[in-house]
Amino acid sequence: MTAALQIDGLFKRFGEQQVLNGFSLQVTRGEVVGLLGPNGCGKSTVLNIICQLLQADAGQVQLAGQPMIEQSAHARTRIGYCPQQSALYPDLFPQENIQFFARLYGVPAAQRNAVVAELMERFSLAPYAATRSGLLSGGWQQRLSLAVALVHRPELLVLDEPTVAVDVEARMDLWHLIEGLRDSGTTILLTSHHLAEAQRLCNRVALMRNGKVVAEGSVPELISQVPGQAVVKVQSEDNQAVIQRAIELGWSVRQHAGKISLLLPHNLNLREVGDALDGSKVNAISIDPVTLEDAYLELVGDNSSIS
């Protein structure tokens, strides 16, 4: 089966900074794939190259088996793009924005009104038909941006941080909308800083570091790459003593912001962990199953920009 999106060996440099360093990824038709990684790892650059807003220094992007470089402007009509920064015209009403982009993307004139009406209803925008787009809340602007990105029924939907600037309630609403798109078979590539978002929406997650994919798979597959079956979180008066004792026991140790997490090589109960760390001035211990966050920290090693 031909991949909906095939990316091979992308390189991109800005001045002295090598942003992409052999980035490769495949997205299957009907799949939702999330890109996770720290700030500056190249996520948005990848999306901009896919959408032909940037040109790679080397490498190839294929859409449904056809090289993007050979399709020129036509390729853009096969992709729906929802950028981080709103591309809406603030003085237009929602239906006018949809109408404008329908014309821009080449939707036949005879179909435009029906497309606008369908998207206004699908994204519950009808109550805001008399509100200028720039006056909508962040969540409703993002809904409208999703509608605009789908106006030409693209083969691939690209979402750059789709819920980055909205409140929790709006984020839940947007997740529900994206889940509906996923369940209807829409092929989606998205970037996110929210691990819960990736876990909820994505069939697969690709973890990025230094401009390339360092691990990819379903959430269970990524978790299986963590060398431990449980995570012990420790509060201690003497972190160094805990770390030293854990190393002696052969446990993997991770420390961030003054907190210690231990990846156990086998399942232990709290009493056994406490006994093993006896004398290390431990105040509190908790044991949790390995999560996507643990996989991210183990495989990428940076949690400064995730939540």
Please name every model-derived segment:
Residues W175-P265:
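ABC transporter nucleotide-binding domain
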Residues G59-E70, H74-A75:
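Conserved ABC transporter NBD signature motif
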Residues Q99, R103, A110-Y128:
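Conserved ABC ATPase "signature" region
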Residues L157-E161:
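Catalytic Walker B motif of ABC-type/P-loop ATPase nucleotide-binding domains
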